[in-house]
From Swiss-Prot:
Gene3D superfamilies: Aldolase class I (3.20.20.70)
Enzyme Commission number(s): 4.2.1.20
Protein name per the record: Tryptophan synthase alpha chain
The keyword Transcription regulation is assigned to this record: no
Pfam families recorded: Trp_syntA
Molecular function as annotated in GO: tryptophan synthase activity
Pathway the protein takes part in: Amino-acid biosynthesis; L-tryptophan biosynthesis; L-tryptophan from chorismate: step 5/5
Length: 268
């Protein structure tokens, strides 16, 4: 949890926003997945948002759904993902690592056991994408017990009560949605969300990172101009993986270049 606090303090002192890439663990293979993480961090990623492959990722569009399928075809399991995470953490002891999960995977061995495993692997945060705030108590309780930051999604139409709950129960960062719907670059992020950012700040919520449809440096600049602390980009990154499956060296080079370009846009 403290890694996020340290990160945001460092970025503030450097007058920068955060750029956080998202990928699916094990896509397209476990070995290449580790090299992809290296490429993202070499490019300047401030934190990582990673998912464990799931058979029915409701919040995701076709690009990230295909990433899940590729990982499954490489026989990637949650156990293997935690082995990959252990290697990533050993190599990068300081970078914040967040997991984006679906509830069934958290339930599989029991909620408490899942968060204990996250603690043992030195994960910083968990966002459970298909659990609304009203059903989040057992998840956030287990998260806090094990020192894991519970991350909550703030939709663009969030009402005041939800904003207050996010501020009260969220830690690490707040996942600010650019728009409703599923992930993907096919639909761009909508207008800047100044009003939500201002309310979240007023209620002392964890710093907002804006995601969904972020695929260009210009959008990163707009996100920061709206007051968000940074941007998360997933589909644009996974698209680079998808388009270069047969040429991994080019894939890794393009990933590093993309992250570097997006990170450069975070200078305030």
């Amino acid at each position: 949890m403290e890694r996020y606090e340290q990160l945001f303090k460092q970025l503030e002192s450097r007058k920068q926003g955060a750029f956080v890439p998202f990928v699916t663990l094990g896509d397209p293979t476990p070995e290449l997945s580790l090299k992809i993480i290296d490429a993202l961090i070499t490019g300047g990623a401030d934190a990582l948002e990673l998912s464990i492959p799931f058979s029915d990722p409701l919040a995701d569009g076709p690009t990230i759904q295909n990433a899940n399928l590729r990982a499954f075809s490489s026989n990637v399991t949650p156990t293997l993902c935690f082995e990959l995470l252990t290697k990533i953490r050993a190599k990068y002891p300081d970078i914040p690592i967040g997991l984006l999960m679906y509830a069934n995977l958290v339930f599989h061995h029991g909620i408490d056991e899942f968060y204990r495993r996250c603690k043992d692997t030195d994960i910083d945060s968990v966002l459970v994408a298909d659990v609304p705030m009203s059903e989040s108590r057992p998840f956030r309780t287990a998260a806090m017990k094990h020192g894991i930051a519970p991350i909550f999604i703030c939709p663009p139409d969030a009402e005041d009560e939800l904003l207050r709950e996010i501020a009260s129960y969220g830690r690490g960062y707040t996942y600010l949605l650019s728009r409703a719907g599923v992930t993907g670059i096919e639909r761009r992020g909508e207008k800047p969300l100044n009003h939500l950012v201002n309310k979240l700040r007023e209620y002392h919520a964890a710093p907002p990172l804006q995601g969904f449809g972020i695929s260009e440096p210009k959008q990163v600049k707009e996100t920061l101009a709206s007051g968000a602390a940074g941007a998360i980009s997933g589909s644009a990154i996974v698209k680079i993986i998808e388009e270069n499956l047969s040429q991994p060296e080019i894939m890794l080079k393009e990933l590093t270049e993309f992250v570097s370009k997006m990170k450069s846009a975070t200078q305030l």
